[in-house]
């Protein structure tokens, strides 16, 4: 039965690890953009992993395009999050300071809060400078471009894209993954489908095990039961096996930290 219905069987973690030296890792744009959400020490580890597996990494052209379009969007969003956190923390401090002379608040607790405030203010300031530096100088963007040079897949022609979008209308109407969860989007409605078609084309041309690394856990990528992600959407695997005849375990970005 397994041979006839491979789409319903999941690859174990041990089997996945055994394939690391012979597979191709295909990165989604969201994973690349997560680099701009990480602390600097984590970014260095991420770059080390990418450099180690550089020859095995590919990025769909459409995913790379979306990555570039959204770098500044992500950085500005992170800066706004810091500002909002600062405001919330300052409001808390102001409320506490108005009551710190009450007898039930010990001097020790008050001193600890002062130390905490100083450290958090320092963290906010350092992270703000770090993100602003990325926004202006683009250091991580340049480093990633260097690491992934030659790793981006070939783009579809405008004619091919029109055909994919035409297929997308039918697929989305029938909830055929991936991408139908984005059917209501005004922009990049067929982005997931275009990425998927790039992956299928690459898999058909290359005799490699494919590991697609993404943090997209919508139901048009991931099978869910009782609120838990239990594996890849079987329809995706069925389509992949039909085109390729090989396993493609789709994992979120935690697969990177398991390398």
What are these regions (language model features)?
Residues 2-210, 217-259:
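Active-site-proximal, substrate-binding regions of enzyme catalytic domains
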């Amino acid at each position: 039965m397994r041979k006839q219905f491979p789409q319903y069987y999941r690859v174990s973690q041990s089997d996945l690890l055994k394939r690391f030296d012979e597979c191709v890792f295909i990165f989604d744009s969201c994973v690349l953009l997560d680099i701009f959400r990480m602390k600097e020490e984590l970014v260095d580890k991420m770059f080390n992993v990418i450099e180690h597996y550089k020859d095995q990494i590919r990025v769909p052209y459409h995913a790379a395009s979306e990555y570039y379009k959204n770098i500044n969007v992500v950085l500005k969003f992170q800066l706004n999050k810091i500002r909002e956190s600062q405001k919330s923390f300052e409001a808390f401090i102001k409320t506490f300071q108005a009551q710190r002379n009450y007898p039930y608040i010990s001097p020790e607790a008050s001193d600890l809060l002062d130390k905490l405030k100083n450290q958090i203010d320092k963290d906010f300031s350092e992270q703000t400078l770090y993100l602003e530096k990325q926004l202006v100088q683009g250091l991580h963007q340049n480093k990633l471009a260097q690491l992934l040079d030659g790793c981006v897949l070939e783009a579809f022609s405008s004619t091919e894209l029109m055909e994919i979008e035409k297929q997308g209308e039918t697929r989305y109407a029938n909830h055929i993954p991936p991408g139908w969860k984005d059917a209501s989007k005004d922009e990049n409605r067929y982005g997931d489908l275009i990425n998927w078609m790039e992956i299928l084309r690459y898999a058909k041309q290359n005799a490699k095990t494919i590991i697609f690394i993404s943090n997209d856990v919508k139901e048009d990528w991931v099978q869910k039961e009782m609120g838990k992600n239990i594996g890849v959407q079987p329809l995706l695997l069925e389509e992949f096996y039909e085109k390729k005849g090989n396993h493609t375990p789709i994992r979120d970005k935690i697969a990177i930290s398991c390398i």
